[in-house]
């Protein structure tokens, strides 16, 4: 477990490579994709906080595994998830759809459907001077999510939606995959200086046990081959190549 503070958002590293994000404001906390519950409860108790809401980007067990235990501790918590996932996230009590907006911690949050990794994956976008996107497993620094339930077209379209957001959007994904993704990218683009420079930055952070996420959309568009893909055919080639990468 480790902490990484930016804009009152704390990252807890858990399991092998998951990151649980805690968005804190005035002693209230919004938890994003709690893979497990123990470190969340520990942090909440040690800092005299309480959980206002839980945001679920999708149904995979390493994103919802801690939710039922957090609900037991805070039974009035709002659990926000896609209306398409009522069966797979049965403890949700606020069901949302693409384009819907919510007010949480005094901020307007827009729901963005980002299909591909699953057929019901959503992201949570907080607009403002310093926009924030909680993206789950759709986009990683240097990579994107595997396509388990959706199609290549859906994932490509989801990434295009992300690219249309303000370029200063700070993106919070749910896994620390950056170094592995960049090594794969360099295997395809060995002379790409932007990717080389990014890898050096990432290795420096990892050497002192810092998270390499979140990341800025503007910078990510320079080093992420999936975001640089010019069309569906190019994206499909990259995704299939990445799936075979060991």
UniProtKB/Swiss-Prot annotation:
Q: What does this protein do?
A: Thiolesterase that catalyzes the hydrolysis of S-D-lactoyl-glutathione to form glutathione and D-lactic acid.
Provide the residue positions that the database annotates as binding Zn(2+) 2: 62-63, 137, 175
Tell me the protein's name: Hydroxyacylglutathione hydrolase
The record's gene field reads gloB
Class in the EC hierarchy, top level: hydrolase
Quote the record's cofactor note.
Binds 2 Zn(2+) ions per subunit.
Question: What SMART domains does this protein map onto?
Answer: Lactamase_B
Similarity remark = Belongs to the metallo-beta-lactamase superfamily. Glyoxalase II family.
Q: What pathway is it annotated to?
A: Secondary metabolite metabolism; methylglyoxal degradation; (R)-lactate from methylglyoxal: step 2/2
List the catalysed reactions. an S-(2-hydroxyacyl)glutathione + H2O = a 2-hydroxy carboxylate + glutathione + H(+)
Q: List the disulfide bonds.
A: none
Q: Name one GO molecular function term.
A: metal ion binding
């Amino acid at each position: 477990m480790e902490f990484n503070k930016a804009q009152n958002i704390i990252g807890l590293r858990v399991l092998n490579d998951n990151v649980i994000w805690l968005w804190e404001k005035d002693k209230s906390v919004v938890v994003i994709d709690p893979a497990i519950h123990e470190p969340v409860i520990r942090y909440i108790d040690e800092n005299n906080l309480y959980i206002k809401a839980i945001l679920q980007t999708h149904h995979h067990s390493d994103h919802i595994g801690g939710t039922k235990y957090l609900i037991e501790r805070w039974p009035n918590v709002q659990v926000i998830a896609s209306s398409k996932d009522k069966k797979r996230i049965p403890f949700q009590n606020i069901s949302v759809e693409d384009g819907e907006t919510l007010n949480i911690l005094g901020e307007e949050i827009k729901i963005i459907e980002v299909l591909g990794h699953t057929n019901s994956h959503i992201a949570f976008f907080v607009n403002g001077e310093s926009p924030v996107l909680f993206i789950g497993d759709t986009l990683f620094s240097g990579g994107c999510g595997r396509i388990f339930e959706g199609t290549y077209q859906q994932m490509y379209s989801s990434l295009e939606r992300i690219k249309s957001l303000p370029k200063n959007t700070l993106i919070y994904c749910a896994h620390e995959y950056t170094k592995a993704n960049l090594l794969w990218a360099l295997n395809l683009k060995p002379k790409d200086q932007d990717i080389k420079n990014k890898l050096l930055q990432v290795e420096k952070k990892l050497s002192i046990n810092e998270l390499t996420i979140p990341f800025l959309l503007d910078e990510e568009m320079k080093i992420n081959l999936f975001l640089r893909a010019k069309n569906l055919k190019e994206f499909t080639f990259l995704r299939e190549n990445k799936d075979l990468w060991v």
